[in-house]
Amino acid sequence: MKDITLVIPAKFESDSLPKVLNELKKFSVKKIIVIPKNDILTFKSAKKYDCKIIFQKKNGYGSALRQGILSVKTKYFCIFNADG
């Protein structure tokens, strides 16, 4: 599964994101977490894990997805929810 990246938009998910990222440790996948600039708590939760963190440039779920997808370097990607 090294050819896949999970794109995880995470807006105000500081409680649920660590649970999801702990479960994902079982798999050999890359992870891109897209966080709004003003969401410091989710950033602090995410930075403890092996993942790429991107701060969202524009508001909205679609914008977060687009920005995350454009950052993917693997052959495949999957959209994954931060709340499990």
Q: Where are the model-predicted features located?
A:
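Cell-envelope/extracellular polymer assembly enzymes that use nucleotide-activated donors
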Residues: D3-T5
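Short, well-formed alpha-helical segments that are part of the catalytic scaffolds
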Residues: F12-K26
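Donor nucleotide-sugar binding loop of glycosyltransferases
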Residues: F12-S16, N38, Y61
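A conserved acidic beta->alpha catalytic loop
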Residues: I35-F43
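Conserved donor nucleotide-binding strand/loop of the catalytic core
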Residues: S45-S71
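Short aromatic/hydrophobic "clamp" motif used to bind/position activated sugar donors
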Residues: F77
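The conserved acidic donor/metal-binding loop of glycosyltransferases
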Residues: N81-G84
